[in-house]
């Protein structure tokens, strides 16, 4: 039968109990509940990933909005989301709320190939607006036939990035400004080079 998308948008922060809110949105059984929220920090995005891990795949749509929420759009499969939302390349103003265009999603991040077995890597920094690292790394992964994806992870602190990496199973991180020195206590091995 036909299903409808029943949406809940929270523009002022995260939704604390995502599974509970989804359950309340399932009224007739013909809904695909959608939750979109505006995270205040990467910790809010991490909580979404944690809660999403308890959900049945493909039975809901989840999205953290804004630049902080970009990982939830790219890694929709990893948060058991039925789909993700993109915008036309001409919609520049939508980038401020974390929208990404479908060409970038597929050409840079190889979105359609991301699955539960995809190894995730990333770059952490703030504000992380002009990095070419995903283009370079994801191109290399494709050239070597690797099931891997490299994503930008906008974070104000190294601690929240390390927690996000732990919760999401990220295999490795590159570090850029302003975290190049604050990452040092988290390193297992250091050298003068």
Identify the role of each PLM range.
Residues 118-193:
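Phosphate/diphosphate ligand-binding glycine-rich loop within oxidoreductases
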